[in-house]
Regions:
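Catalytic core of pol beta-like nucleotidyltransferases
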Residues: 3-69, 76-230
């Protein structure tokens, strides 16, 4: 399962990010364009966009974000025939064709998380996700709650949740022999660690994610496919 959450040392804001939202509603024109873009990329690779549901998740669905927080799109497949090989193929596609694109007029980059078969959006809340927007219903699955972004000590589960998702993404790619894509994901995690440490020091989301990947054996698997771990 994949879920991206807030860096808990990001400032707590009075509103959701108004570069991304109109009040508490995601900016429809921008997201409609991006969802159409996802659909076209899927079509080019033999996937039907209508077989999937799409959700806005992560730190931008909370009151705790920064100007560089990712725009996280969780992708849930509705087909029983969607297996781990299909999922790995789709993860590779989003890594190469969708991840890293900027949300218009911001420093926010898109990041896409393809969920395993059988996982629905409600399963993600058990990993620490706090809010999500349903693009199918144009409504909140669970609304943002500013009170949940106040106590830094209680936010640590969000770091671990993000580490779980990075690990899942990397290991899925390794299992599918998509080694270069797995290495690309490592480079993203490494760069994020460096950037977070410059701003926040060792007690930062990027550093905790990096240590999680080391502790749970993901880095050992990356070393086995030739990735140098810094």
């Amino acid at each position: 399962m994949n879920v991206k959450e807030a860096n808990i040392l990001d400032p707590v804001q009075d509103t959701l990010d108004q570069d991304v939202f109109n009040g508490t509603t995601p900016k429809k024109d921008f997201f409609d364009y991006h969802l159409d873009h996802i659909g076209e990329v899927f079509r080019q690779h033999g996937f039907n966009k209508h077989a999937f549901d799409y959700y806005l998740t992560g730190s931008l669905c909370t009151y705790q974000y920064s100007e560089t927080s990712d725009v996280d799109i969780s992708i849930v497949c509705n087909l029983k025939s969607f297996d781990e090989e299909d999922r790995a193929d789709l993860i590779s596609i989003v890594v190469n064709s969708l991840d890293g694109e900027f949300f218009p007029r911001t420093l926010h980059r898109y990041q896409h998380f393809v969920q395993p078969h059988g996982v629905d959006i409600y399963d993600l809340f058990s990993l620490g996700m706090r809010a999500a927007w349903d693009f199918q219903k144009n409504d909140w699955v669970i609304k943002p709650d500013r009170s949940k972004a106040v106590d830094v000590g209680k936010e640590k589960p969000d770091w671990i949740a993000t580490g779980i998702q990075f690990s899942d993404k990397i290991n899925s790619l390794i299992d599918a022999n998509k080694y270069e894509d797995a290495k690309s994901m490592y480079k993203i995690a490494h760069q994020r660690r460096k950037e977070d440490q410059v701003i926040y020091g060792d007690y930062s989301e990027g550093n905790i994610i990096y240590k999680f990947l080391d502790n749970n054996g993901t880095f050992d698997r990356l070393r086995n496919i030739g990735q140098r771990i810094a």
